[in-house]
Amino acid sequence: MGITLREINGDNFDEIIALKVEKYCASNLYSLAQAKVYTEAIPLAIYNDDIAVGFIMYEIEPRDNNEYWIDRLMIDEKHQKKGYGKIAMEIIIDKIKQDKTHNKIKLSTNPDNFIGRKFYRNLGFKETGEMHGDEVLMVLEY
């Protein structure tokens, strides 16, 4: 299984915005629009070999003491339950950890997304007991 994260450009834009997930995640088109407005956001396509299977976006959040945030993770509904999301998250977490000036990564998820919350806990994230808007705030400290 060759999971890689790739830049989104004119060559793969259409295939990335065509990826779908049933619930709990903004569309990839909306996320790409956010990345255009919030230029600190880094959107990436998730590929298994040469097949686009998902989308991930992270950033250093200037409105939150320059903390790292993983803003989005989605795996297309046809490609779920194959370990792609876990590998993509591990790649991003390892990349963020290379920045020795930080020691935590934040994300938030829908409180009803019990599968997602368990997924993030299995990666080492802990629920803080706080809400980020209407979502559960989770933090990975390292």
Q: How does the language model describe each region?
A:
Residues K86, P111-T128:
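Conserved active-site alpha-helix within GNAT-family acetyltransferase domains
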Residues I96-S108:
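Conserved GNAT acetyl-CoA-binding A-motif
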Residues G2-D71, D76-K78, K95, D99, ...:
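Acetyl-CoA-dependent GNAT
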Residues K106-R117, G133-E135:
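Conserved beta-strand-loop-alpha-helix junction that forms the acyl-donor binding cleft
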Residues V136-Y142:
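Terminal substrate-recognition subdomain of acyl/acetyltransferases
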Residues H79, G83-I91:
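Conserved acetyl-CoA pyrophosphate-binding loop and the N-cap/start of the following alpha-helix
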Residues D76-K78, K82, P111-D112:
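Active-site acidic-Proline motif in GNAT/NAT acetyltransferases
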